[in-house]
């Protein structure tokens, strides 16, 4: 795009969602993250960098630097960003997929970037399944037309949420 990059949103502390932030630094954007993001990045960055470098021969990755958020959103708070012709809301969620999940919601188009709070396949369960389901229940109540997941294709909200909510509900009931 020819438009300036004002914000880079690090949606959570998994490497496929934060590596590459350096590519935008020449624009001097605000780096937005959850209030718990920097702590998680600091404790996991070197491990993720080594792991990725062992799997991918890439000088850029080997020389990657830790980029921390300079705008930190408190849990359950929303940062509204005016992009001129639209306002986007960046929300910090309670612990679910990770303890530092952010989403982005475009009020104008009712498009919701869910990062990995929603994915189009059975998710990896490494966090709070009860918290994750709670967050999905909250998303279901939002006025959303389209969901852009962290992995997978853009989908209509109801098509996206019904199967994953059923999966979590069944898993929770059968594990207890």
Cite the ranges covered by each PLM segment.
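Active-site HxH/HxHxD metal-binding segment of metal-dependent hydrolases
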Residues: 2-80
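N-terminal-biased segments
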Residues: 61-63, 84-89
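Metallo-beta-lactamase
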Residues: 80, 87-170
């Amino acid at each position: 795009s020819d438009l300036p990059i004002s914000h880079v949103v690090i949606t959570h502390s998994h490497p496929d969602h934060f590596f590459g932030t350096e590519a935008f630094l020449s624009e001097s954007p605000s780096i937005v993250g959850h209030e718990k993001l920097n702590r998680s990045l600091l404790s996991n960055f070197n491990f993720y960098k080594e792991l990725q470098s062992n799997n991918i021969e890439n000088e850029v990755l080997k020389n990657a630097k830790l980029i921390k958020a300079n705008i930190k959103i408190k849990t359950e708070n929303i940062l509204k960003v005016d992009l001129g012709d639209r306002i986007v809301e960046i929300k910090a969620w309670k612990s679910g997929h990770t303890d530092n999940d952010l989403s982005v919601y475009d009020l104008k188009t009712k498009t919701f970037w869910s990062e990995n709070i929603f994915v189009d396949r059975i998710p990896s369960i490494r966090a709070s399944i009860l918290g994750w389901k709670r967050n999905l229940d909250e998303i279901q109540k939002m006025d959303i037309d389209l969901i852009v997941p962290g992995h997978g294709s853009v989908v209509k909200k109801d098509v996206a949420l019904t199967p994953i909510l059923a999966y979590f509900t069944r898993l929770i009931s059968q594990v207890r």
